[in-house]
Amino acid sequence: MESMFSSPAEAALQRETGVPGLLTPLPDLDGVYELERVAGFVRDLGCERVALQFPDQLLGDAVAVAARLEETTGSKMFILGDTAYGSCCVDVLGAEQAGAQALIHFGPACLSPPARPLPVAFVLRQRSVALELCVKAFEAQNPDPKAPVVLLSEPACAHALEALATLLRPRYLDLLVSSPAFPQPVGSLSPEPMPLERFGRRFPLAPGRRLEEYGAFYVGGSKASPDPDLDPDLSRLLLGWAPGQPFSSCCPDTGKTQDEGARAGRLRARRRYLVERARDARVVGLLAGTLGVAQHREALAHLRNLTQAAGKRSYVLALGRPTPAKLANFPEVDVFVLLACPLGALAPQLSGSFFQPILAPCELEAACNPAWPPPGLAPHLTHYADLLPGSPFHVALPPPESELWETPDVSLITGDLRPPPAWKSSNDHGSLALTPRPQLELAESSPAASFLSSRSWQGLEPRLGQTPVTEAVSGRRGIAIAYEDEGSG
């Protein structure tokens, strides 16, 4: 138990310091990191200062990449590492502190739009794909040539999807290829209608077609994620895909396939459990998990309104990356809600090492908004932007007089009947309103006070005026190992 809250003392003596060695051979550096394309991006913008953001696992190549780019572009490069939140998000705050005019993001990315206008280029590090093995795996999982199927992949394998589709199209008639949804530059206008954008990908659907009609074939996993259950990108797709459609995955190295239906069922069951925990909760901790993704302020205000409407008390916590040791300092909080990008919001849920559940914003929406989800939509969204006004999935809170608030609700965890939420005015910053009683007493309902009264130890209690006054008497003599009145037995 001690190791969950602190590192052992000998870890400091055994820790190896210094910069990790070069991960990629120098001759392969240009191809792996697409340095020619990146250099062209920098020269076209005419930037003098550029930030290079690397995740922890790629920092070994950062110095060599920065030196090569400075040599080819003449611009000053700044390396960003150890981001305060998830490394998959663009660190616009770190780039601004360095005075950078553009940012290059290397490694896995959630492709969430940044909160502030900044030219950004993404380098996903292309991963080799065994196309012939993937074709055989696809044919084994999809024997019907007329069945509609979408080709999906992890970001590092997206470059091979068109080549895979070219090999499959002579036999399969209804094949759709997804592509990464890179954020559009601020103020840019597209001459053509944008395709459907969901799960960080774009889907060029034909007119009249819906994504819910398609099954899915996912290329990725294994090498990038040894444990598929801990892969937030695949989990996001499994949660959001239509429950009645087939979903299979394929390893790009070996062609090994797996039907993901059972895993999707487990993820949805876990999400339903988390929604029930949120409905039972009285105190909710809102964790600020990002400061660099667009609309994070609006989403935080939306979540606070949700908890207030549902009669729950909420606290906003800015702790950086959530860890079990940090969140264990708040035992009064029943559930935490992590406001982060889609990948960052799912990662703590999949780890399973926290003392209290960590929810995604859409799970809190399902728990606190009786009008959500809208008809025909399963509550399996993964990005908080889908909950805000302007999104096709946004559903406003019902008015206080709506019958939806009075619908009887029984907890599936405790079996108790949940009381309807008590609406509070916006200027009430304390607990529920004080109510006069016939005996001229005041009754106060406070989740914090209820939690304190249930604790076995409530701190030092002065008990002023409640302790009888007695004369001072002689205490025990000696030391703890042998007091004088204990004898020598």
Curated annotation (Swiss-Prot):
What is this protein called in UniProt? 2-(3-amino-3-carboxypropyl)histidine synthase subunit 2
Q: What does this protein do?
A: Required for the first step of diphthamide biosynthesis, a post-translational modification of histidine which occurs in elongation factor 2. DPH1 and DPH2 transfer a 3-amino-3-carboxypropyl (ACP) group from S-adenosyl-L-methionine (SAM) to a histidine residue, the reaction is assisted by a reduction system comprising DPH3 and a NADH-dependent reductase. Facilitates the reduction of the catalytic iron-sulfur cluster found in the DPH1 subunit.
Q: Does the keyword Glycoprotein apply?
A: no
Provide the cofactor note recorded for this chain's UniProt entry.
Answer: Binds 1 [4Fe-4S] cluster per subunit. The cluster facilitates the reduction of the catalytic iron-sulfur cluster in the DPH1 subunit.
Quaternary state and interactors: Component of the 2-(3-amino-3-carboxypropyl)histidine synthase complex composed of DPH1, DPH2, DPH3 and a NADH-dependent reductase. Interacts with DPH1.
Source organism of this protein record: Homo sapiens (Human)
Q: Which GO terms of the molecular function aspect are on file?
A: 2-(3-amino-3-carboxypropyl)histidine synthase activity; 4 iron, 4 sulfur cluster binding; metal ion binding
**Residues bearing Phosphoserine?**
S7, S446, S456, S488
